[in-house]
Amino acid sequence: GLPVCGETCVGGTCNTPGCSCSWPVCTRN
C-alpha cells in the first residue's frame, strides 16, 4: 500500500516483486 517500490508503471506493469501498479507508480501492499 505504500509507494516505496521506486518504480513507475505507466505501461501498466511492475517488475518489482511484491509490488502492484497504482497508476502511474508501483506500490507495495
UniProtKB/Swiss-Prot annotation:
Instruction: Give one Pfam family.
Output: Cyclotide
Answer yes or no on keyword Disulfide bond. Answer: yes
Disulfide pairings: C5-C19, C9-C21, C14-C26
> Mind listing the GO biological process terms from this record?
defense response
Cross-link Cyclopeptide (Gly-Asn) maps to which residues of the chain? G1-N29
InterPro entries given in the database record: Cyclotide (IPR005535), Cyclotide_moebius_CS (IPR012324), Cyclotide_sf (IPR036146)
Q: Which domain of life is it from?
A: Eukaryota
Q: Read off the domain note.
A: The presence of a 'disulfide through disulfide knot' structurally defines this protein as a knottin.
Its function?
Probably participates in a plant defense mechanism. Has cytotoxic activity against a variety of drug-resistant and drug-sensitive human tumor cell lines, and against primary chronic lymphocytic leukemia cells. Has weak cytotoxic activity against primary ovarian carcinoma cells or normal lymphocytes.
Name assigned to this protein: Varv peptide A
Q: Which organism is it from?
A: Viola arvensis
Lineage summary: Eukaryota, Viridiplantae, Streptophyta, Embryophyta, Tracheophyta
